[in-house]
Amino acid sequence: MHAILILGAGPAGAAVALGLRRLGYPVTLISDWRRFPALEGVSVRVLEALRGAGLEQALAQALQPSQRRVAWNGEEHAQNIEYLLDRPAFDRGLRQALREAGVQLIEGRVLGVQSTEAGHRVQVQGQAEQVGEFLVEARGRQAPVLDKGLRQGAGKGLRGPETVSLLNRWQGPVGSAASAVYSLEDGWAWMARRADGQCYWQLTLDVASAGLPGKVQLLEYCRQRRQASAMAREFFADGEEQQLHLHARSSTAILNPQVCGAHWLRVGDAAMAVDPLSGNGIFQSLSSALQAPAVINTLLQRPQNRALAQRFHGQRVEHLFQRFARIGRDFYADEQRWSEQPFWQARRHWPDQQQAHASVDFAALRIERAPVLRDGLVDEADVVVTPDQPLGIWHVQGVELAPLLRRLRSQGAAQALAPLSPEQGRVIRGWLLSQGYRP
């Protein structure tokens, strides 16, 4: 059986590893522990995606429900409950789930990767060299590009406005869990506190216009910015900040120019990383990772369909990136008080002016041949392309849409829907109405 190496044990790498194990592949996953104990706010939708990827066990000791406040464009309101995800606990849970699935885990820092058409050799600090036929890059937005010899064409990578996030963590007094987000003239901030008193505050700024001080002064700069915010002072109750730490990182939106080759694949933030305001990073990572096992299976088992599998992965990664980028753009456009300031001006028009969600138009529906996932492989089928789903929809509730649309256009609704079960008929009618169909 083909030996597969995965670099990175975050949600994307873990989801790919578990999916490959279900397909029977031997998997070796190499990863170092993250150096900063991060906290993330996740929605119910993210939790459902994690459970769908087989990662529910990893959530067991990592979640705290929290009421989220939002102060944006001069208005303040409390949004739905979000869940504060403790990344160290979550990462431990991910590794446990991987071990139980039979994934070989190697802990250590990757020192180098040599890739050829024949395979991949990975040097790991303090460990033996690892060799595999296929490589999955899942080390996040900082993952290095592949050897030049294996790149196929230039690709059209994209970068959003250069953005930096400054995360502060400290120990405060014990209390209730909470989280909040608020806009500023030169950026925006997210803050959270756990019930055990761990506090987090992250400031996101425009690199070109921020005028940040040197590294030594950054911690004091962040403290002053926090003290200047009435919302932050109230949120943290002016509590003492003990064991204060700083972690600075790039949060620029990035689409990698090439995400799939014959013997390698990029997933998660290594494939595309979007602005943190555009949505949750874990959800975006899973969006590209869940399709990866079928893509890899096709590349290894159906060489005649390699181009189709590469097209499938590349198109979907780019589509997800553009959609999330447009959602972020619309959030930025909602803040109108500082629209001419450099931070907001650059982000309210990027990546383009196309709608994040296209208007429905039943007359615009068309049938095309496109790659789909069938029985753990990438195959080709007739799909229905809609204004909001340009890559096409194959089936809904087990009903293939292309044959249904053909029947609908030639026979009318009653005859076209007659072969369906009552439940299928109910769901399909709802879908047709949502696409602008009027009987």
Identify the residue ranges that each predicted region occupies.
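Beta1/beta-strand and adjacent pyrophosphate-binding region of the FAD-binding site
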Residues: M1-G10
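Glycine-rich FAD pyrophosphate-binding loop
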Residues: A9, R21-L39
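N-terminal Rossmann-fold NAD(P) dinucleotide-binding loop
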Residues: G13
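N-terminal FAD cofactor-binding segment of flavoenzymes
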Residues: W33-R69
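Short beta-strand to alpha-helix junction loop
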Residues: H77-A97, A210-G214
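FAD/FMN-dependent oxidoreductases across multiple families
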Residues: L84, P213-R329, Q336
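Predominantly flavin-linked oxidoreductase catalytic cores and closely associated redox partners
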Residues: R99-F235
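Acidic, low-complexity/disordered tracts enriched in E/D and polar residues
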Residues: Q345-R407, R426, G430-P439
